[in-house]
């Protein structure tokens, strides 16, 4: 999930781009060669502070340049954010490589600011190793425009001790799986009756509530926006399906009474609540155990399972991060950029990858992180790196494998569950507007989901979608 909010990119982007160009005196081409004739690969997000991160990347730069004499890596301190992105892109001043998110990549591809990587990916043997579901996110019309480096899908994290107390664990050590959102609500009721604590926690603030609400609404049959034949986007979540999904959130508070008393829950508070036994279940991805280790929740007390289905479909949100390569990059720069990225995120189990990966899981186990969750990967089973990662997870597993089996099985075989990326435009603004709707139904017993969504839909259209020009 991106942390940067999309701003209007019409007159602002154009005027800012002109200003940048005038101030810099630069043209619209990425500088290609250094004084020694080496092809320059500028890399965005380069660390500025002295420390381990900078030392590691400088060492990687040295190794890369030693092995690839015709390339030179140049660090660029600019870190991706949409407020400055479109100005830099329009001025031709993007670094060759820049990091972005699933949320933004479709916009960037549509705007033409990322290079076509398809042929070079195939040439370097990368194309056939990318997870096909992830490949869809970074593709347009059968061509690939970004290099994925991380992926995740949501499931449900649960407190094993609470599930055992409530009689919700099976004899084989796996949990009972709520197959629908309504079943999850019933589980939450039983958990609260048993433990006296909230059975479920749901975020409501800093865009997190809207973010997680979208996948619930999708499962009720709702959509949030549609692109017309004229290329313009239309908000469409003033629908009975979206209202039904928001009613489910409302019912968690007023019908089932299974939520914490606190109704302002951001990302940090969400995992703090779960990690301190303030709730028995939370929507989470494979990295959830790492978010709660500081709250001293023991590995054997943490479990993961699949996402429930809604009345219309079974769907989970897939997110992640990608590296894009500037549309101004030369063919030689694209070649070098992908070679560099393979050092950062390789599909192959190189000796360096094996050493680093084993060390990482060993350290996690020693620090009390749950090791055992096999998260979604950007690579498929053709990747030796993915196979080795899973071997190390099995080797250093420090909890009962049965507690996370349902999630691991879900990641490996979705069994008919639809993977859906985040909304294609103005996702962060949408999440913020939906946060307001969620907070209202949780603080006002008389709030009407349909009325709230009518206004939210109108505001989203007027304030954001109508201002897009790409």
Give residue ranges: language-model regions.
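C-terminal lobe and pocket-closing loops
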Residues: 288-298, 312-317, 324-432
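Glycine-centered hinge/linker elements that transmit conformational signals in sensory
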Residues: 183-190, 230-263, 293, 303, ...
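Hinge/lid segment of periplasmic solute-binding proteins
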Residues: 101-155, 164, 179-187, 212, ...
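Short, solvent-exposed loop/beta-turn-alpha elements that line the ligand-binding surface or hinge
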Residues: 115-130, 173-177, 200, 222-244, ...
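Extracytoplasmic/periplasmic solute-binding protein
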Residues: 140-149, 154, 164, 182-234, ...
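Alpha-to-beta junction loops
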Residues: 71, 89-100, 113-115, 197-198, ...
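Short helix-initiation/N-cap motifs at beta->coil->alpha
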Residues: 76-85, 103, 179-183, 261-275
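Conserved N-terminal structural module of periplasmic/extracytoplasmic solute-binding proteins
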Residues: 2-111, 122-126, 332, 348, ...
């Amino acid at each position: 999930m991106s942390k940067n909010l999309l701003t209007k990119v019409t007159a602002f982007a154009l005027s800012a781009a002109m200003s940048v160009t005038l101030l810099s005196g630069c043209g619209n081409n990425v500088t290609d060669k250094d004084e020694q004739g080496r092809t320059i690969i500028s890399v965005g997000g380069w660390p500025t502070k002295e420390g381990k991160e900078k030392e590691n990347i400088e060492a990687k730069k040295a190794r890369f340049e030693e092995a690839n004499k015709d390339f030179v890596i140049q660090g660029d301190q600019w870190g991706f954010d949409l407020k400055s992105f479109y100005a830099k892109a329009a001025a031709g001043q993007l670094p060759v490589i820049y990091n972005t998110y699933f949320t933004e990549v479709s916009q960037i591809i549509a705007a033409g600011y990322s290079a076509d990587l398809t042929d070079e990916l195939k040439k370097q043997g990368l194309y056939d190793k990318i997870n096909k579901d992830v490949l869809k996110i970074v593709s347009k019309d059968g061509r690939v425009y970004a290099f994925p480096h991380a992926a995740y899908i949501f499931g449900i994290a649960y407190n094993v001790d609470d599930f055992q107390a409530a009689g919700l664990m099976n004899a084989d050590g796996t949990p009972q799986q709520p197959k629908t959102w309504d079943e999850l609500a019933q589980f939450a009721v039983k958990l609260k009756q048993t433990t006296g604590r909230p059975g479920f926690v749901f975020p409501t603030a800093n865009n997190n509530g809207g973010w997680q609400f979208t996948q619930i609404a999708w499962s009720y049959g709702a959509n949030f926006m549609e692109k017309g034949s004229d290329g313009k986007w239309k908000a469409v979540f003033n629908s009975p399906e979206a209202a039904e999904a928001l009613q489910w959130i409302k019912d968690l508070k007023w019908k089932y009474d299974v939520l914490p008393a606190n109704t302002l829950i951001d990302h940090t508070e969400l995992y703090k609540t779960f990690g301190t036994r303030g709730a028995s279940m939370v929507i989470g991805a494979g990295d959830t155990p790492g978010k709660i280790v500081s709250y001293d929740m023991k590995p054997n007390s943490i479990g993961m399972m699949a996402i429930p289905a809604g009345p219309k479909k079974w769907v989970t949100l897939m997110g992640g991060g990608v590296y894009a390569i500037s549309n101004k990059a030369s063919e030689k720069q694209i070649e070098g950029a992908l070679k560099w990225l393979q050092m950062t995120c390789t599909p192959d189990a190189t000796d360096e990858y094996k050493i680093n990966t084993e060390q990482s899981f060993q350290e996690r186990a020693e620090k009390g992180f749950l090791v055992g969750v096999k998260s979604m990967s950007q690579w498929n089973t053709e990747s030796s790196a993915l196979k080795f990662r899973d071997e190390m997870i099995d080797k250093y597993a420090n909890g009962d494998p049965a507690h996370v089996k349902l999630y691991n099985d879900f990641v490996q075989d979705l069994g008919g569950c639809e993977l859906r990326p985040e909304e294609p435009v103005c996702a962060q603004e949408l999440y913020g507007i939906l946060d307001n709707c969620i907070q209202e139904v949780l603080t006002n017993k008389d709030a009407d989901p349909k009325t709230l969504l009518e206004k939210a839909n109108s505001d989203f259209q007027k304030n954001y979608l109508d201002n897009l020009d790409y």
